[in-house]
Amino acid sequence: KVHPLGFYSCTLLHENNQKIRLHYWDSITNGEQQSSELMIHDHIFDFKSWIMLGALENTEYEVSDEGELYYLYSTKYENDSSILKITEDSLKITHKNSSIYTQGMSYVMGANVLHKTRSLTDRAFTILHTQDMEYTSPRVLSNTNTSESEIIFHRKDVNEHELLKKLTTLVF
């Protein structure tokens, strides 16, 4: 499926509260991602990510009274869609740290850590192990107060031909 954050995601294993997923980051998203103003988010799961190809930059943020004001969206999932709903809440956040991870490296992140991740290369391939910690609504932040109270992103399936074409370009 195409993920709202601009990569392709394939769940290989789902057992109890854990998943193993493949993520493929491509320089050509064809507009198949949500607004760049909606990239800071957190998760309801802890995860470990292994970088198999390419490089990623992960930037973490923390809540701080001296930070920049961001508007808070809650996330819910219906069928194959992610639905962001603006809340009445806002947060002030500051940059905590940025880290670059390259092929052969791995990193871990806890649930509820505000962050954004981007590929630094034309293509990146990662394996992600997640473990659900709680079921609350994942948070998404925006520094722009949009007039849209609800934003819907359909996680469309990637057809087999398109996926095969992308995977045959990978060289390990």
Residues covered by each model-derived region:
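Short beta-strand His + acidic residue motifs that chelate non-heme Fe in jelly-roll/DSBH
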Residues: 58-59, 115-120
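A short hydrophobic beta-strand segment most commonly corresponding to one strand
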Residues: 122-138
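Long hydrophobic alpha-helical segments typical of transmembrane helices together
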Residues: 141-172
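Short acidic-glycine-tyrosine-enriched beta hairpin
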Residues: 62-111
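Conserved short histidine dyad/triad with adjacent acidic residue
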Residues: 22-42, 59-65, 111
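Short, conserved beta-strand element in jelly-roll/cupin
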Residues: 42-58, 62, 129
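A short, N-terminal "cap"/entry segment at the start of jelly-roll beta-barrel domains
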Residues: 1-26
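Hydrophobic/aromatic beta-strand patches that form the interior of the parallel beta-sheet core
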Residues: 48, 107-108, 125-127
